[in-house]
Amino acid sequence: MQEVFAGVMQRRLKENRRENDVLQVFMDAIYKDGTKLPPHEVTGLMICLLFAGQHTSSVTSTWTGLYLLQDKGKVLKELVEEQKRHAKVDHDSIKDMPLLHAAVSEALRLQPPLIFLMREVLEDREYKGMTLPKGDKIFLSPTLAGRRADVFTNPNEYDPYRFLAPREEQRKFSHGWLGFGGGRHRCIGENFAYMQIKTIWAYLLRNFELEMEGGLPQPNYEALVVGPHHHQCFVKYKRRAAPL
């Protein structure tokens, strides 16, 4: 893969050609000291971008479905009705699925794929009586942040409606929800991830009747990306006589 990206870069430089894409952004990037990113760093960043959302998106898509199916109630029925309002699945219709969007957000709140986020202290700070010295690392827990009772009502319960108006509990204070991190290093693939996961579940809901066998599986905290224990996930499916 390094060779593929390196080859594309070399052709662009040889032909003095520019493109409107993320590779060009990295090729043009400059450090504070004025130096450009060396080719091996550009190819490394491209490979990271390619794989960064692979496991997190698939795991979040899985949790989204598992919570929907174990709920067996109002949410799933309303999601089916939401799909019926759209003649087809395309970019515009995917953007107009607020309940499905909220269902993905709720799955991320309850089961974020990353155990922690890490930041470096850039200057000495005092916080609630503690001294945070420059150079120290701070670890943030999206799981704990998503289950704070002062932010989310009944935080251990599955309730996608908390993300919809008028409640919008995630807006109670800045960074009240860390599904995609925050600050200048917030996940740049957030919009794509939502589009991807919502597309998957739009097609599944429109074409299949789904039912979970057994209860909600336990998260596997031994994995780099926290997904459900795969041997506990059983779902029955039946193709609809006619798609929604």
Regions found by a protein language model. Name each.
Residues 1-61, 97, 163:
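Conserved cytochrome P450 catalytic core segment spanning the I/J/K helices
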Residues 1-30, 72-82, 99, 103, ...:
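Cytochrome P450 heme-thiolate monooxygenase catalytic domain
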